[in-house]
Amino acid sequence: MKLHIYKGICSFFLLAVSLSSCQDFLEFEPYGLEGSVNFWKTENDVQKALNAFHEFTYKEGVTGRGLMWFENCSDNIVTGRPQAEADQIKNFQMSAGNGRDAKETWPAMFQLNAKANDVLRNVPGMAISEEMKNKAIGQAHFYRAFAYLWLAPFYGDNGPNGGIPIITENTPTAELDQPRPSSVLANYDMIIQDMEEAGNLLPYFSQLPSEDYGRPHKAAAWAFAARAALYAAQYDAKYYNTVIDYCDRIINLTGEDKRGLYPDFSRLFRQENNFCEEYVFSLLGNAIEGPKFHGMSFQNGGWGLYNTWGYFQPTLELYKAYEKGDVRRDATILYPGNHITFVGEDIHFGVNPSGISSTSGMTFRKFISSWESRNSIGNTVNPNSNNSSNVLGMVLIRYADVLLMKAEALIWSQGEGNTEAKALLNRIRKRAGLPENSQATKAQLKNERRCELAFEFQPSRHIDLVRWGDAQQAYSKPLHGIKVTLRTDGTGIDHIDEIEIWASRTFNPKVHHVFPIPSTEISRSKNLTQNKGY
């Protein structure tokens, strides 16, 4: 299969990317895209348009650091190395002209939306097979909803700012500069509707040929619809029923499509498990191109073996959120004194070979598997350390999140102690090696969600704190890390001290619940209004 990257009818010439299979290297080959008059003629044209949906995954500002600068505001993470603009974001002092790489997300998602609208505008009237037509229309609905779901939680609200401008295949060209809807609920309703349409048209995952692994399917559409409904429920509790409905569709799948929790959390995030029973939807890459996020998570400099960037590091608050015996803690966070293998070398963290290069004294290890082998560079990770693409899928939603979303909807809509919510949370706890003793309280749900999903690109701990109404209190507390003192004879760690590494911050829930829309987007629009307070 050739996976060509096509940037929409508005851009007629682009470097194409072809992907022969999910594990093979990407081949780069240029092609000139004819104008729209000559383009929408054949199934091959449609396939090129569908392949173009994946172009955003290769942008460092989108799937590298991108929205992680906003997640860096949470109490799970601190900026792992000096970065003034990042500190402004974390301290809720950013301007509309800042945003670091995150500002690239807004235009990238509207480009994705435009591509989806091109398909929805042109494909229905084409003389092609119904199978190809359904595939194309289903994927277009999926990626249009996907684009809005990437933006809505970070930039939209139910007042005073409103939602994200809605542009569909029916929006006249003269009216593309749409004003914002009065509420972000208009976006969430559209996302749910689009994902419903996608689910109706797309195949089940089991029906995908292996060369199409990574493309949308029914369960992925339903899962993102559930996430949109969960985010909408902070404004209107009726959406909790929608969350439960979509989660049940996934939970009740049978046969080859039945989803489950992969038994060993410590080995979940490995290439061989990219499409295990826990998979719902990820963005794929390889050693030539793809998402770069994983390489941002290890300490700066990669122990002299690979130039990882070290921008996001775990807090002691996150480390302590895990209960004693929780296997997720040591599978997520590398603590001084523990060992990992990195590019074939045994790293006794904090002791050899180059100590600790992290603000918090710890580093994330959740996504380190692609870097373990001595032969990893050029095979499982990009040889260019400024482009840390790798073979591990960048998880955006997995089955554990589906269980947690349903449990949350049950607790918030039917009350703490809900029997079904207990069972769902205990499934999560059992896999983590913990007693199955959840009482399904709101506090327990929040902590299970924090520990299970820590540092995954989506969903966002910061957005969770905002929608729960917990952000102001959480961010009023300082954050902590650790300082390691080695024995004078060089034989190991003498002692570890807890230290404050980030001062308390002022979070104004009337302003900081959303981020400023990039000033470049405001300046090129007559109708787009800035979020208040920025």
Name what the model sees in each region.
Residues 47, 51, 55-56, 83-155, ...:
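Conserved, well-structured interaction surfaces
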Residues 127-137, 234-241, 413-420, 436:
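Structural helix-adjacent loops and short alpha-helical linkers that scaffold large soluble proteins
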Residues 324-398:
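Flexible, polar/acidic helix-loop-strand segments at domain edges
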Residues 23-86, 156-164, 188, 192-197, ...:
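An aromatic- and glycine-enriched ligand-binding surface/loop that stacks and positions planar moieties
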Residues 1-32:
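Bacterial Sec-dependent N-terminal signal peptides
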Residues 132-138, 208-220, 438-439:
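A glycine-rich, coil/turn loop motif that links secondary-structure elements
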Residues 21-22, 54, 78, 82, ...:
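Long, intrinsically disordered, low-complexity segments
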